[in-house]
Amino acid sequence: MAHQLDEHTLIAGQIAPADVAALAEQGVTMIINNRPDGEDAGQPTSAEIEAAARAAGIEYRHVPIARGMGPTDVEAMRDALHAAGDGRCFIYCRSGNRSALAWAVARSEDGVSRAELARCVGGAGFDLAPVSHLLRD
């Protein structure tokens, strides 16, 4: 189940290659995958999701974030979000939580207020507390 974070961004847990065509029908123009390959047995690989995205005419970025979130993760996430521009972006990880938090930290770097990020992330059912120390004021 996807959660809307802002007018351009959807967050969800793991998807399958077969789900990508439906995302294209919903107007998604960029998929950002925050799962490292091999995180769980049987999960689709980045290459499998990328192939499905390309076949559906969707841009794809693999921004794997394992335990913790460092400056290079934040910068890669920002770059991917900037590449999406004003298009509709679908970001996923195992549950959606890591993606929501990575999105929030990246958007904080772009000047989005802590209050606005809390509203967006909280409205999707996630909590900013684990990354509050990374957010700009």
Give the positions of each predicted feature.
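Substrate/cofactor-recognition hotspot
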Residues: 96
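Cys-dependent protein tyrosine phosphatase-like superfamily
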Residues: 1-90, 101-137
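Short cysteine clusters
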Residues: 93
